[in-house]
Amino acid sequence: MRKSFFCAMVALLTLALTGCSEDWIEEQLAGCQASFIADAYGIGYSLKNENGDRTTTFKEGENIIFDVTIINSTGYELHLADERGILMGIMSVFRSDGEYVGNPFQSASTTSELRWITVEAHGRLHWSYPWIYDKRYAHDDRYDSSTSFSTKVLSPVAPLPKGAYYVMMKYKVMYHIVDNPTPGGGTKGSNDIELRIPFTVE
């Protein structure tokens, strides 16, 4: 049996960095049972200023850098399915009253096939994207996928005016053991999880 996990994600955003028991994983693999392992991976998310400092307070006209890290703390490959555009979701900005402002992507679309992001055992993936287009942050598609995908395009957007904002993400995680003979695929997932990160432009 391949020692590999598949993780299907509605969206992705959390500040937690966690680990899990590989003995427990081995036990689940041996029994070929559906496994929901909430701590198999970690997600690091932060907002940074143009100097690369983490902050939630920005000057008017200053660029905002969305910084994301996916960490696989297990000894197995972790496969994440980008069903609804992970990167688009984590960079969606709202005003404090809930009005949607937008995101820095002009367009993004997928085929009907599932698109997988692979994180190697004990590995990590990292992305940094600006709110205002900056060629120093050229799009780097680090997905590992055998399916076709139309590239997300960073578009010119105006600096955010003064005000209070937040980024919000709802996500849930589903794990499925590869080659699981259980009828129905043997998949189990979490409930929806929501997280907001407020920030201000002064």
Report the location of each language-model feature:
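Short, solvent-exposed loop/linker segments at the N-terminal edge
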Residues: 56-62
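Sec-dependent bacterial lipoprotein signal peptides
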Residues: 1-18
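Asparagine-centered strand-capping/turn motif at beta-strand->loop junctions
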Residues: 70-74
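Extended, well-structured beta-strand/loop surface patches
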Residues: 89-164, 168-202
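Bacterial Sec-dependent N-terminal signal peptides
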Residues: 15-43
